[in-house]
């Protein structure tokens, strides 16, 4: 049961962090969908770096456009590097290119982009239980649905689809 308790704590604290940042960004005019999209792009970069670090795998991301190239930067340099990374990755002729199809940065204020990157960098995502990642994703979609004033807040993402995304 110890693992379960840890998962719940991790899940709750991470959901809180991710949601808190969504609220902050919404105040800056960055919509929830844009935030989740950027989070996905950045998480992919971070998990690629973890794969290299922990398992000695070769990076799927071209040199000069990897996670460590991004986290080292601040201010406009960070925004510029992130935008160049998205552009380059969207032009790849493989799965990476598919993942980053028409990818664009929607968090153009450096301070907020840095906050998202820092939050992602503070966690080890690759070794995190798939159920935890799925639960975080699910609860954030649900919370967004509850917080939407437009009434367009229903979400019907089937659990197996979420599983496929996070595993």
PLM features per residue range, with description:
Residues 1-167:
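Non-catalytic, mostly N-terminal accessory regions of nucleic-acid modification and defense proteins
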């Amino acid at each position: 049961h110890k693992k379960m308790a840890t998962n719940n704590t991790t899940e709750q604290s991470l959901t809180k962090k991710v949601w808190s940042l969504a609220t902050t960004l919404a105040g800056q005019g960055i919509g929830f969908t844009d935030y989740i999209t950027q989070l996905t792009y950045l998480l992919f970069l971070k998990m690629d770096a973890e794969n290299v670090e922990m398992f000695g795998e070769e990076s799927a991301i071209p040199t000069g456009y990897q996670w460590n190239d991004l986290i080292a930067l601040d201010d406009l340099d960070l925004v510029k590097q992130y935008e160049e990374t998205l552009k380059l990755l969207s032009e790849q002729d493989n799965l990476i290119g598919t993942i980053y199809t028409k990818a664009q940065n929607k968090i153009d204020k450096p301070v907020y982009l840095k906050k998202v990157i820092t939050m992602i960098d503070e966690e080890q995502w690759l070794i995190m239980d798939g159920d935890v990642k799925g639960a975080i994703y699910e609860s954030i979609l649900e919370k967004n649905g509850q917080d939407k004033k437009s009434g367009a807040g229903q979400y019907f993402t089937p659990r197996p689809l979420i599983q496929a995304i996070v595993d």
